[in-house]
Amino acid sequence: MSIIYESEVPNPNTLFVRDPNPQICEWQGRKALQLSGQGASLLIVPDLHLAQGWIEVDMGADGAAYPGIAFRIMDSLNYELAYIQPHTSGQWDALQYDPVFHGSNTWQLYYGVGAQQHVEVPPKTWLHLRIEFQDQRALIQVGTQEPLLVNQLAHHHNSGLVGLWTFLPAYFSNLRFGDDAPDFLASMPLAGNENSLAVTVTEWFMEGFGVIQTEENGILNLNRYLPLSETEVRLVREVEVPTGGKFTFNVGFSDQLTLQIDDEVVFKGENLYQNSPKWEERGYVKPDQQIECFLHKGIHRLTAILKAKENFGFGLALNIEGDGYRLLPAHLCR
């Protein structure tokens, strides 16, 4: 095993640190680095880029927190991220893959198989997190528990820096990483996205920008294209109907949506995070809102007006059910 960086307690004075008050302290019988997690703390080891390899660290928290590992860091606003959640220990999201785009977390867009894993991660305990990655796949594991297998890492850049991350206070020790080719790939199945949604609209024309595409899971990730300062967009697509009939639009979104057909509002709704143990109240983007409309023969213009209210994922998923319709090319929308 080739180790290219190792530190019992990472020294914040020699690293890039986005944290107002990093501290070296004692926690659970061990010397540790404490990050405050105010506004999401990020520590980056400079000058060491990894395209493939492994990263491991011990971490823990006294209560609610999201301590994790950032990798393939392109800059302080764009990177791959995986973390544990001691306050949801044993639940479906106790281990979460959550790529960061333009400074926004996106876990409401990346969930389920390939993004979340049941693990036991109790508070007030040292826990070992390890990530192995190569190409667009990664294995993320807490101790010897069942690993999370990510078949499609979200970012397109294939190399970057390594760091630590947390929202809310957490403790870290024994950070090390290397660039050995991981051996998990031989036993990891090459599969499509098992969490892919049944969507029919995979391209949109975003006004003021151009044509954009959905992710592998069928969800449109607006954070990929927009900075946090852009909180409202208009998405357009045209559909041709050969004969009149009833159509069903199944839509999922985050955070607020107004859907128009030929400039007539057919749906308005809000889907926000709620601090709840219920899956359906977390604000995940899933096309489970149904709108039924009668469309006459001809070309109809769909307009989705989306507004962001949180930094957990800004996105849309749309599936159209009906006979004989045809989506016109997105680049023809103006």
What are these language model-derived features?
Residues 121-151, 256-265:
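Carbohydrate-binding surfaces in secreted/extracellular proteins
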Residues 246-259, 302:
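Aromatic-lined ligand-binding clefts that engage carbohydrates, nucleic acids, or primary amines
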Residues 37-104, 181, 205, 230:
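Secretory/extracellular carbohydrate-interaction modules
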Residues 258-303, 307-317:
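Beta-strand-rich ligand-recognition modules
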Residues 141-161, 266-278:
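Short, solvent-exposed beta-strand-to-loop segments that form ligand-recognition rims
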Residues 104-128, 291-292:
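Short, aromatic/His-centered strand-loop micro-motif at the edge of beta-sheets
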Residues 76, 171-242, 275, 307-334:
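Extracellular/secretory pathway-exposed regions associated with glycan biology
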